[in-house]
Amino acid sequence: MGKTAQTFGKISRRSFLGLAGATGVGVALTGCAPAAKQEEPAADSLPATGGDPLDYDTVSWSACHVNCGSRCPLKAYVKDGQVVRIDIDSDGDDEFGPGKIYQMRSCVRGRTNRQRIYSPDRIQKPLKRVEGTKRGEGKYEEITWDEAINLIATTMKEIKEEYGNDAFYIQYGTGVLGGTVSKSWHPDQTMFARLMNLWGGYLRQYADYSTGQITWEMPLFNGDAWSNNEVTDLVNSKNIVLFGNNPANTRMSGSAMQYLLTQVRLQNPEATIVVVDPHLSDTAVGVANRWIPIRPGTDMALVAGMIQYLFSAGKLDEQLIRDKFVGFFSDSFADDVKAAEPTSTAFMGLDKSGALTIDEDMSYEAYLAGTGAYAGTGEKTPEWAAGITGVPADTIRELADLYMDGPTATIQGWGPQRHSNGGNNSRAIAMIAAITGNVGISGGGTGAREGVGGVPFATPTAIPCFPEKNTVGVCVSFFDWYQAIEDYTVMNDATWGIRAIDETGVTSYAEEPGTLKLR
């Protein structure tokens, strides 16, 4: 008995969506006049490709390694050396909560790994551009693997002899970010990087498409251990605030944030979930109690308005601030900095000799009041913040009070730090979590991206014959790698912001991506 499907014009819905998926373009089912219903074969009567998915020899555990990085576990059913079916994690008890093991079921990207493996568009044999043709003409001829290896090796030797090892660069955007051996991130941790280190090194990169600023800024505020509470701890939160975090679009799988948020909503229904985001995201629609729209890149001003309100109203724990913060009060700089023992070379407030470099008039207290170095900027009241952020002053006060009625978890996505002031945005979001006493407690967190629990696994770094040190001294921003190809001769300290290691051993990092650094 066939199933009935509504058709649109002369194309059935099934065919229409199949065509859209095949062409890789987004389409909308609007403006199509429905035609008469037609009989369409049932899904279970369609011919299977690659053999019977229930007839297999072995089952092997694998993982989805696309660029979201969630690494959802997958089971591969194999028959005669061919994958006949991909299945999700359905083993064990599915218990969500702190210390519990829950099933990490992949999204559609993981479930379609078999189609990816056997895609007719996948290049499975070496191809060489036809002699005499130009790049972009798309004319290739098949060659053997031995020919390909010899051609690549010969070309690499010629490049090294003429230009040196800094003419080699490893681009990380390969589409297999999460692989264990085939991983592409971080380039320094890949097998190819180890090979290049054996052969003299390569041009390195710093920063990345995702976390160019937050990666450097969070350790300056929270120290080296800045990871957030594990996501399952959200069942202990009274309030959950998401800044620029939309996992319904970015991390929707069973081992990622969106599924976990839905579980938190089910198990902790009394929790108030607030989404601070310029647009009404799918996450805000799906799980939030409240959406607070904000002008992009103004998170720092929002937090300043919140803290000024709490501070002026006497709602903050002053002793906590004096004990745990450096630079909030103008009268506590010297003692705080002298008592601090930097755990890394990237410590704000110290010069080459270890002396204090921050002027007392630049305290956060002075910034909030508009005094000292900030004279003339005005007091950072909720009304001031409202004019910058577009968030009403009363809403700013309500959000601030929410933090004092904790425990309140703060989780920021990577959108707030993708601005010219992104470093300050990311630190400000972490600051509102810390200054309200929500760090280091169950149901709270550091204000970074959601924390995850994981199991360590062996990596190529454990292989003793592969040296980890890259002897090439130049490191270029991954944003600027194209310039190193087109005209590396103009990349100097004046035009591309070169930084060099100084006599104290402290490496100077630019806050914003897009500069060149010598190390």
Label for each model-derived stretch:
Residues 2-316, 324, 328-332, 336, ...:
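N-terminal export/assembly segments and adjacent metallocofactor-ligating motifs
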Residues 193, 300, 304, 397, ...:
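Non-catalytic, well-ordered alpha-helical scaffold segments
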Residues 267, 272, 279-405:
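Long, well-ordered, tryptophan-enriched scaffold segments
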Residues 85, 204-205, 316-321, 395-396, ...:
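Acidic/polar loop patches that form or flank catalytic/metal-binding clefts of enzymes
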Residues 57-58, 169-171, 397-398, 444-449:
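Beta-strand segments within the central parallel beta-sheet cores of soluble alpha/beta enzyme folds
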